[in-house]
Amino acid sequence: MRVDGGGFKVDRKYDVPVRAGWPAVLRSQTRVLDPLVPIELGAAFADGLMPASVNVRMTVSALPPIPFASALKGALEYPYGCAEQTTSKGYAALELDDSTAKLLGVPGLDAKKRRERMEGAFGRLASMQVSSGHFSMWGDDSYISPGLTPYIVEFLLDAKEAGFAVPDNVLQKALARLSEDLLAGGAQFYGSDKREHLKFANQAYAGYVLSRVNRAPLGTLRALYDNERGNSLTGLPLVHLGIALSQQGDKNRGRRSIDQG
């Protein structure tokens, strides 16, 4: 949709998903190959489905059966667009270049479509950024999740490193917000289950993202590791913190944090 007049020009693109009146059906099998037994994917596997809508993929690999291809395809085709969904769809377009598509055995995005998807993601995220530098979930100030900001900033940094024209004002505003929050103790996650874990995980993620542009305060990272690492209930926050410490110059603490993760 384009509106042009009175000194203003606005372009907007909207996806209008069209699908059957029934939900999608996913059927999968994982097998260990026997060199003496042939393997086949019989027609019965699609019984009860609409033949024209069936998409079948068989992969033989020595790697664990992690469904990267279907995950990327699902993200690209997802019809909704909150801040998290917009970022995840943008990540799918970022990752699905020609070489990755060939590696996964799936149709890729040509350069034009990939650029359009990335620019669409940048524009939508820019419209969702609020005055604080965080991002609203649906484009207004009604719901803001501070824990989402490091994820969005990481996407913007990855896209910039890949050569895309990331809006610098959006990126710098979000980086400044992460820096201020990290120095001030981060989001508090009041009323949430596992509050201390969420707080630590968010600070560690923010520290990792800031360390990619050499803007993570080393003293704050050290204090997080020395005093709060016990709050982490999973390994990923410790890995994030370890990478941040290493990139900011404290390789000893960084190595220990990664090992503990």
Please give the residue ranges for each predicted region.
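Extended, solvent-exposed functional surface patches
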Residues: M1-H197, Q203-Y225, H240, A244
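Primarily a tetratricopeptide repeat
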Residues: G120, R256-D259
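Solenoid-like repeat scaffolds
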Residues: A223-T234, G261
